[in-house]
Amino acid sequence: MTGVQTCALPIFAFIVDPIDGTTNFIKDYHVSAISVGLAKDGEKYIGVVYNPYLDEMFTAERGKGAFLNGKPIHVSRNPLSEGIVLFGTAPYYEELSKKSFEMAHAYFKKALDVRRSGSAAIDLCSIAAGRAELYFELRLSPWDFAAGALIVEEAGGVVSTVEGGAVTLGQKCSVLATNGRCGRLE
């Protein structure tokens, strides 16, 4: 047999963050999670985020909805003025800190309040469960957002880059996740 052979099976890849919110975990501040995403042909396919402190398991499979401990969840319908904004400060990128806090302040003026937890996975799941309305961070690695972004989307939310582009699993990028009623700063 000669020539190139190809495999007809889809390509799967796990994208894992064994401790999302590492600094919180080290400091015994109980806001961290285990985040496991499964990509199929480069796209988000399955997402699982487990918060061991609250015994909360968030799950989603593309096209099948999002769940918290087996019960369906959905993003809130609140407008930004009645919403909580969650944000991350991209702590490993000092050059982004000023812009992160400027954005948080701008959202603070328009929203009910703002919060910073230190766990992107938990923040994304908070959007999915309707506990908050918007989350942003100016630079995340795929293992930070792969599982949580799918959970948000399957709960009826919208995930993009802060700039409005598509979030891809192949590189670091900014992330903006919303309930669909809240959006980018103008």
Describe the function of each predicted region:
Residues 21-22, 85, 127, 152:
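Buried hydrophobic positions in well-ordered alpha/beta secondary-structure cores of metabolic enzymes
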Residues 12-31:
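Glycine/serine-rich anion-binding loops at beta->alpha junctions
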Residues 1-9:
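Short, small-residue-biased leader/transition segments that mark boundaries at the very start
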Residues 36-124, 172-186:
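Acidic beta-strand-loop-alpha-helix segment within the catalytic core
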Residues 102-108, 122-186:
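Oxyanion/phosphate-interacting regions
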Residues 13-15, 35, 47, 135:
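Short glycine-aspartate micro-motif
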